[in-house]
């Protein structure tokens, strides 16, 4: 009998706790209020900061509270091209400039946006990773809905009252730079989660993994495995419908509708 394999140990583990010790806070849009719904409110970018475990930089934006004599600082996902000292305008009547926050229904078709709300008032859920953006495709004034194209390429119909930041998320091209050293990968995943290093099954001994052992590294058996296999054998391509490369498939032209 072999040892308890990695997949079994994982299933018996505790609930995941995010590594949030050095993080700067949750990046959100302003809570929607009367000033944003009917006009606009002005803020100033105080600082652009790095948040550990996140690819995109964050912008500290200071707003004067419209209801109390105090200032409020918000953490926005920084759009490409904003700078410290820049004025940021949030609201229905704000201008269409990089870094401003507007309802998607007021933006012309083809506008590039990021940190898009999925539901009105949820303060930004879509297109928030570094270099990502969504595109406003079309508006339906009768139903008050707007169609946007997400970074994955899928299209989503959302409410026209949903807000978004104009522009692309900063930090694009981050994954183009190779990691090169194990030390960099160590620090990267230390800030994110405990998932590194990951030893391959074929590099293990036979007691530690079904694919382990042998005079050279090879699986030595089919990598596909049935759905009802016991937990200690359930590794590889689980209940795969098909394997291998997609050969001879016809690329379908995407319809714009």
From Swiss-Prot:
SMART domains: Ribosomal_L2 (SM01383), Ribosomal_L2_C (SM01382)
Cellular component GO terms, alphabetical: cytoplasm; large ribosomal subunit
Recorded GO MF terms: rRNA binding; structural constituent of ribosome
One Gene Ontology biological process: translation
Annotated PROSITE patterns: RIBOSOMAL_L2 (PS00467)
InterPro entries referenced in this protein's UniProt entry, alphabetically: NA-bd_OB-fold, Rib_uL2_dom2, Ribosomal_uL2, Ribosomal_uL2_arc_euk, Ribosomal_uL2_C, Ribosomal_uL2_CS, Ribosomal_uL2_dom3, Ribosomal_uL2_RNA-bd_dom
Keywords for this protein: Cytoplasm, Ribonucleoprotein, Ribosomal protein, RNA-binding, rRNA-binding
Region (Disordered): 207-231
Domain of life: Eukaryota
SUPFAM superfamilies registered for this protein in UniProt: Nucleic acid-binding proteins (SSF50249), Translation proteins SH3-like domain (SSF50104)
Pfam families found in the cross-reference section: Ribosomal_L2, Ribosomal_L2_C
Protein localization: Cytoplasm
Function statement: Component of the large ribosomal subunit. The ribosome is a large ribonucleoprotein complex responsible for the synthesis of proteins in the cell.
Family: Belongs to the universal ribosomal protein uL2 family.
Subunit structure of this chain's protein: Component of the large ribosomal subunit.
Name assigned to this protein: Large ribosomal subunit protein uL2
Lineage: Eukaryota, Metazoa, Chordata, Craniata, Vertebrata
């Amino acid at each position: 009998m072999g040892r308890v394999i990695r997949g079994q140990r994982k299933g018996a583990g505790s609930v995941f706790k995010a590594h949030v010790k050095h993080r700067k806070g949750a990046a959100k849009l302003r809570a929607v209020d009367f000033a944003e719904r009917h006009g606009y409110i002005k803020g100033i970018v105080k600082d652009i900061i790095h948040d550990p475990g996140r690819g995109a930089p964050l912008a500290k934006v200071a707003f004067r509270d419209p209801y109390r004599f105090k200032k409020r600082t918000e953490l926005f996902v920084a759009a490409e091209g904003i700078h410290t000292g820049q004025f940021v305008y949030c609201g229905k009547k704000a201008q269409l400039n990089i870094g401003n926050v507007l309802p998607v229904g007021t933006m012309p078709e083809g506008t590039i946006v990021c940190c898009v709300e999925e539901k009105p008032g949820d303060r930004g859920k879509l297109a928030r990773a570094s270099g990502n953006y969504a595109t406003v495709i079309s508006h339906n004034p009768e139903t008050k809905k707007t169609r946007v194209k997400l970074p994955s390429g899928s299209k989503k119909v959302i409410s026209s009252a949903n807000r978004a930041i104009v522009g692309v998320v900063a930090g694009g091209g981050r994954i183009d730079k190779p990691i090169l050293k194990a030390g960099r990968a160590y620090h990267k995943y230390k800030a994110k989660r405990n998932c590194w290093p990951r030893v391959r099954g074929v590099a293990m001994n036979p007691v530690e993994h079904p694919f382990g052992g042998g005079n050279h590294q090879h699986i030595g058996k089919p990598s596909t495995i049935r759905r009802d296999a016991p937990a200690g054998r359930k590794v590889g391509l689980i209940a795969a419908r098909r394997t291998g490369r997609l050969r001879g498939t016809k690329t379908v032209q995407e319809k714009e509708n």
